[in-house]
Amino acid sequence: MSHTKEILIDSKHPLFDKSGMFYKEFPSDYRQVRFFSMLIVQKAPAEIKEINLLEQQISELIKNAVRHGNKKDPAKKVRVWASFSTGHAHLIVEDEGEGFQQVEEWNKFNNKRNECFENHNFEELENYFSYRTPESTEDDGGNALFAAVEYWDGGVVFNDKKNAIAVYKNFNEKKRPGIEISSS
């Protein structure tokens, strides 16, 4: 059985080191999340943009901060620190909310979900398609976090208050992901 990736909780984790990172602050305007994401991802080298997958992952982190953390209150800010190279993407996204207090519960849910999948127990897996809390709306489902723990292979960590998330993605510098254009 493979090891299930988990979200950590540790304000002192090295991924929360903001040294040398680009900083940007945004109002919690849900309609502009994609625009805010593009402002961040434009700092990344073309080699790691992966046909907009990086932008999509950044967008989900900002969207969660605006929607779940700040409850779409435009008076509240989302703060983003970012660092990019051809070998990595490192982000910290912080909101002014109460924090995602269900991280441990989400980890248990995700572990059970992965266990069902690995054991081909698809009938039981039906119970683990979508993670929901009492605050969840019709279109919430925890899918952004499921994708995040897979995409951000260098770690996904919340601070102790659980209102900031730090993520890290490693890129193979020899293999340049993205679209290859040939002249033939």
Can you name each region flagged by the protein language model?
Residues 17-49, 117-126:
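Helix-loop-beta hinge of the Bergerat
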Residues 77-87:
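Short beta-strand/loop element within the Bergerat-fold HATPase_c
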Residues 163-174:
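Short C-terminal beta-strand
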Residues 145-161:
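Conserved glycine-/histidine-rich ATP-lid loop and adjacent helix of the Bergerat-fold HATPase_c
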Residues 22, 87-91, 163:
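Short beta-strand element(s) in the Bergerat
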Residues 49-79:
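Conserved ATP-binding N-box helix of the HATPase_c
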Residues 36-60, 133-138:
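Conserved short strand/loop->alpha-helix "switch" segment adjacent to the catalytic nucleotide/phosphoryl-transfer site
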